[in-house]
């Protein structure tokens, strides 16, 4: 049978990132109050727009630079920083994530391929034990669909399966990899109702990441085999 490599996203694919953000907001409201909390999220969105990626460390840095000490003393700022540094990400993994990764490991190579700021995403993946679950096979890029060649070079396989919640990433990756890639759309999180562009239809759609356990190797390979 051809060798398989599974390229797994993190945010809203393996981990309920929308819920994480709600938790952050609740903690920030306690530490900062409503005005500075809104200020932080405004900075967060500004950074996301400028960098085309979420960057928590840069957002925190700008918060410190833009808010004077009388409004945000250093101790409070350090408490805010610790909210992000010490968050128990493992508690926000979707049900049966580890079982799903263990199942996929019986079919091929499992690789976490995430995008975002390199520091915060790395902490998230390690602290949630996802890195351990895939044997340390973790790649983080600012925009992973722009690094397909690097992904394939690091983890060569006859066929690839990308499991992701973001329609545009799946479309872009298929455009690059063609029939060497099976795309699996996981309908979780804020992109779950987003339509695919140009009538694109994912090869496989599942409502929950745990449903991936019901897919056989033959089904993952069906696109390559022209079925």
Set out the residue ranges of the language-model regions.
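Active-site neighborhood of HAD-like aspartate-dependent phosphohydrolases
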Residues: 1-43
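Conserved Rossmann-like nucleotide-cofactor binding loop
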Residues: 13, 118-119, 168, 191
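A metal-dependent, Asp-based hydrolase signature
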Residues: 20, 34, 45-85
């Amino acid at each position: 049978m051809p060798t398989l490599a599974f390229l797994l996203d993190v945010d809203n694919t393996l981990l309920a990132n929308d819920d994480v953000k709600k938790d952050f907001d609740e903690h920030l409201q306690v530490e900062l109050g409503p005005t500075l909390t809104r200020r932080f999220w405004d900075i967060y969105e500004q950074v996301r727009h400028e960098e085309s990626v979420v960057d928590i460390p840069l957002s925190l840095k700008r918060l410190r630079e833009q808010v004077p000490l009388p409004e945000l003393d250093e101790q409070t700022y350090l408490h805010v920083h610790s909210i992000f540094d010490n968050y128990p990400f493992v508690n926000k993994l979707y049900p049966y994530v580890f079982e799903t990764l263990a199942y996929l490991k019986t079919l091929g190579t499992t690789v976490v391929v995430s995008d975002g700021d390199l520091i915060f995403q790395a902490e998230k993946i390690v602290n949630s034990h996802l890195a351990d679950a895939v044997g340390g096979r973790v790649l983080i890029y600012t925009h992973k669909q722009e690094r397909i060649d690097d992904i394939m070079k690091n983890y060569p396989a006859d066929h690839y399966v990308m499991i992701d919640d973001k329609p545009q990433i799946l479309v872009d990756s298929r455009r690059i990899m063609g029939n060497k890639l099976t795309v699996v759309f996981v309908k979780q999180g804020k992109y779950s109702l987003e339509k695919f562009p140009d009538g694109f239809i994912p090869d496989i759609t599942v409502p929950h990441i745990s449903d991936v356990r019901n897919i056989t190797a033959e089904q993952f390979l069906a696109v390559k085999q022209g079925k």
